[in-house]
């Protein structure tokens, strides 16, 4: 399992530290002794539950969010008023009132009412935002998520309870919802099937739009910021070259993490917004106090009558960055964003727009550049140059929201198995949502630099800007209405009311921006289409691979027929007090119970005479003294499928009929806490097969995934079979936690080659050219795109630390075959 794979399972599930007994009933058949006791709360469980933010943290995060989220929406006053289409070349007082009125109501309805009061309350999932979060929330509620994936936020039994299961009726069932056909239209199976496809499409399309916006926003912001230098120095002609350098620097500093970057940028945006407030108040008081009339919707309606819906293509630039704000929830939290935007950013921007309107009414000639002309003191004053510098810096910072948004949604897509397993770096111990993805950062940097070189100047980019953002608004509204209906089970009238209020406005904004397609808006649409196709292809290929994994898992009873009717082995525990050195050899049962070591009830079957079903019939399974640890890429199989073993294990025992006397199936999980205490890191559960165990090794999201000799000893000292092995190897009391154990250990990793179905047999022969073409494309995509990328992210045992090369070659084994999907 690679570092990136470890982060895929980054999820916060409650874990109990049981060192005494597990209640013996039909759900929990394993127990340490006959006495029942209540599970004790572990440190891990307490840390998982302690996620509430103090007011001090809220205020600090709110301030930090200024430097990461509001640069885009906060710099809109630079260009919005002069981007709006007016009925006359020289707008009248009513025209200016109308423009400000449209900006005010657009901002209030979309940003405040829709996102702050509705979407941020209903659409977040497990502390994350964006369309992926809404999708995950709906999929979790309807149980229609990707097969074999734990959706963040799902209530689930503890690792300990899951390891304790010996029987399950769902090992080979999909996670689809079993609906009663008579339960009404809302839960009709056909409708649910449509909903599952619709929300996945919406999720992928919305993410693709954000990613394409991630190419345009940095390009727009940096080009416009550097072009501003020409106002002070008209002879400056190196806008493109300087912009490329600034962009490269901007992406280079992302490795320091959103925590440091946002806190560094926050004072700049804070001063910028303060400057907007001062400038706005000054212009209102001095030039036209009656500008507050523009807050009446009458003037917005009048401007729409005279100019049509094309007004929205310019006015919507005042709300760019809103969708990125929603995607960035994981970096700062919902409440800090809501408070900062509502109480500070929103008033500052509205006051600034009112001030610009007041100035233009008295100075119509200033419409070409209303922001700089309306700065108190006039051009070349010291206030002008202060605001000029702040405007340049703030505009550069504006791209930060989209960059962080791309990191957030990519991280969520990886966790849902909808994206290649890129390495995720958590940059904060306190907040799991603050992530940095190096590969995405460098790919985004290359894409943005190429986009900047292609568009060359800010005017060309601005002409292409806006369509993707308005489509994103529409996608979010569609998903949030499904969320209202199926997650919150609200009356159908509520989503209908929501649709009547917001959808017409968003559809109008989309229509008003369609004219931009010929002026460059085709580019974000094209990039969205490319991203959409890749996400859909990856999800399709991964679903085929997961289905194949489930299909090829082997039932224990089929592999070992004599175990079909055997009772389960008994205990599952975690390693309590793991910091103390202990030897299992010569220890009494009472001592083992005290240390929380697994105590399986040995089956009546003779461990050395177990028969295995092979292609040659039943054969005796021979066991030699030693230990094998087989690593699974996902803990899902290890936890949720106690009746089965991986296909590669079946191949091993049925082909060679000889395995080590102790066999451990091991998986690694990453929890949504920064660190896991050493005494709660490892959980061991016995299996039906004598001498076989299931093991979960747990890490926090800030910890390096590393298995060394000491951790191996932690695992081995919890297995009773180690007692007999230690005696055979004359170890006596030497196999203790503080020293490396010398019992031979073989580490087995699954390494398969993914290939497309061959379709070469007679039953698959066809003369249909379309079918042949489809199969050829399928083969190219799977064999030459999916398979190489998938192989790059397989673990290959990188997390297993063996310093000596010769020892590594002896102790690591890679088993697999060709997997056809």
From Swiss-Prot:
Residues 1-47 are annotated as: Disordered. Pfam families: K_trans, K_trans_C. Coiled coil: none annotated. GO terms for molecular function: potassium ion transmembrane transporter activity. The chain crosses the membrane at residues 58-78, 102-122, 191-211, 239-259, 261-281, 307-327, 341-361, 387-407, 435-455, 464-484, 492-512, 517-537. Its main location: membrane. It comes from the Eukaryota. Residues 1-57, 123-190, 260, 328-340, 408-434, 485-491, 538-821 are cytoplasmic. The keyword Transmembrane applies. It is found in: Membrane. Residues 17-27 have a biased composition (Low complexity). It is a multi-pass membrane protein. Residues 79-101, 212-238, 282-306, 362-386, 456-463, 513-516 are extracellular. Glycans are attached at residue 460. Residues 1-10 have a biased composition (Polar residues). One of its GO terms (cellular component) is membrane. Keywords: Glycoprotein, Ion transport, Membrane, Potassium, Potassium transport, Transmembrane, Transmembrane helix, Transport. Belongs to the HAK/KUP transporter (TC 2.A.72) family. Major high-affinity potassium uptake protein. PANTHER family: K+ POTASSIUM TRANSPORTER, OSMOTIC STRESS POTASSIUM TRANSPORTER. This is High affinity potassium transporter. It comes from Schwanniomyces occidentalis. The lineage of its organism: Eukaryota, Fungi, Dikarya, Ascomycota, Saccharomycotina. The gene is HAK1.
């Amino acid at each position: 399992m690679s570092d990136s794979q470890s982060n895929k399972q980054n999820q916060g599930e409650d874990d109990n530290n049981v060192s005494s007994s597990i209640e013996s009933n039909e759900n929990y058949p394993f127990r340490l002794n006959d006495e029942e006791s209540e599970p004790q709360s572990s440190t891990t469980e307490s840390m998982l539950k302690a996620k509430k933010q103090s007011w001090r943290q809220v205020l600090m995060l709110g301030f930090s969010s200024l430097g990461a989220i509001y640069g885009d929406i906060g710099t809109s006053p630079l260009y919005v008023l002069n981007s709006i289409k007016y009925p006359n070349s020289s707008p009248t007082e009513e025209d200016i009132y109308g423009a400000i009125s449209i900006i005010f109501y657009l901002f209030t309805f979309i940003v405040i009412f829709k996102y702050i009061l509705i979407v941020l309350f209903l659409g977040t999932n497990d502390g994350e935002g964006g369309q992926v979060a809404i999708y995950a929330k709906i999929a979790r509620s309807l149980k229609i998520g990707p097969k074999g994936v734990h959706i963040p936020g799902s209530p689930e039994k503890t690792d300990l309870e899951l390891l304790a299961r010996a029987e399950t009726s769902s090992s080979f069932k999909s996670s689809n919802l079993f609906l009663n056909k008579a339960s009404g239209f809302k839960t009709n199976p056909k409708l649910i099937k449509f909903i599952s496809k619709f929300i996945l499409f919406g999720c992928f399309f919305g993410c693709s739009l954000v990613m394409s916006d991630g190419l345009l926003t940095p390009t727009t912001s940096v080009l416009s910021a550097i072009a501003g230098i020409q106002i002070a120095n008209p002879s400056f002609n190196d806008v493109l070259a300087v912009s490329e350098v600034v962009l490269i620097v901007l992406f280079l500093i992302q490795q320091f993490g959103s925590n440091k970057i946002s806190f560094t940028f926050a004072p700049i945006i804070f001063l910028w917004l303060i400057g907007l407030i001062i400038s706005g108040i000054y212009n209102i008081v001095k030039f036209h106090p009656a500008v507050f009339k523009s807050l009446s919707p009458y003037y917005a309606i009048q401007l729409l009558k005279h100019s049509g819906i094309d007004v929205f293509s310019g006015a919507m630039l005042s709300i760019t960055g809103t969708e990125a704000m929603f995607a960035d929830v994981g970096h700062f939290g919902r409440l800090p964003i809501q408070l900062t935007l509502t109480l500070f950013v929103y008033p500052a921007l509205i006051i600034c727009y009112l001030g610009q309107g007041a100035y233009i009414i008295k100075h119509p000639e200033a419409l070409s550049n209303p922001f700089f002309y309306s700065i108190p003191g006039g051009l070349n004053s010291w206030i002008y140059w202060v605001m000029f510098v702040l405007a340049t810096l703030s505009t550069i910072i504006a791209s930060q929201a989209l960059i962080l948004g791309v990191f957030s949604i990519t991280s969520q897509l990886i966790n849902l198995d909808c994206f290649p397993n890129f390495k995720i770096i958590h940059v904060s111990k306190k907040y799991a949502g603050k992530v940095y993805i190096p590969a995405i950062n460098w790919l985004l940097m290359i894409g943005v630099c190429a986009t900047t070189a292609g568009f060359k100047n800010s005017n060309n980019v601005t002409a292409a800007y806006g369509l993707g953002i308005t489509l994103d608004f529409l996608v979010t509204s569609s998903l949030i209405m499904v969320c209202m209906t199926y997650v919150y089970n609200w009356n159908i009238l509520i989503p209908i009311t929501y649709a009547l209020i917001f959808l017409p406005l968003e559809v109008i904004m989309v229509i008003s921006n369609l004219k931009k397609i010929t002026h460059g808006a085709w580019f974000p649409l094209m990039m969205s289409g490319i991203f959409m196709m890749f996400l859909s292809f990856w999800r399709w290929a991964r679903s085929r691979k997961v289905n194949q994994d489930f299909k090829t898992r082997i039932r224990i009873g089929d592999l070992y027929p004599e175990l079909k009717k055997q009772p389960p082995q008994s205990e599952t525990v975690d390693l309590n007090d793991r910091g103390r050195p202990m030897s299992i050899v010569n220890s009494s049962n009472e001592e083992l119970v005290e240390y929380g070591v697994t105590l399986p009830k040995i089956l009546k079957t003779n461990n050395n005479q177990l028969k295995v079903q092979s292609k040659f019939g039943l054969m005796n399974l021979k066991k030699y003294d030693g230990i094998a640890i087989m690593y699974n890429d996902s803990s899902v199989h290890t936890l949720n499928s106690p009746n089965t073993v991986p296909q590669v294990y079946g191949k091993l025992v049925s082909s060679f009929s000889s395995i080590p006397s102790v066999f451990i199936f091991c998986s690694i999980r990453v929890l949504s806490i920064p660190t896991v205490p050493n005494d709660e890191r490892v959980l061991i559960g016995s299996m039906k097969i004598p001498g076989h165990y299931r093991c979960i090794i747990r890490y926090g999201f800030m910890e390096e995934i590393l298995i060394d000799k000491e951790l191996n000893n932690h695992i081995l000292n919890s297995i009773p079979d180690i007692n007999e092995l230690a005696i055979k190897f004359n170890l006596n009391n030497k196999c203790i936690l503080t020293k490396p154990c010398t019992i031979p250990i073989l580490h087995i990793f699954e390494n398969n080659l993914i290939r497309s179905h061959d379709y070469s047999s007679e039953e698959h022969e066809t003369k249909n050219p379309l079918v042949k073409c489809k199969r050829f494309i399928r083969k190219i995509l799977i064999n030459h795109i999916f398979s190489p990328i998938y192989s790059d992210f397989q673990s290959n045992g990188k997390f297993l630390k063996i310093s000596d090369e010769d020892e590594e070659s002896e102790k690591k084994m890679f088993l697999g075959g060709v997997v056809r999907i």
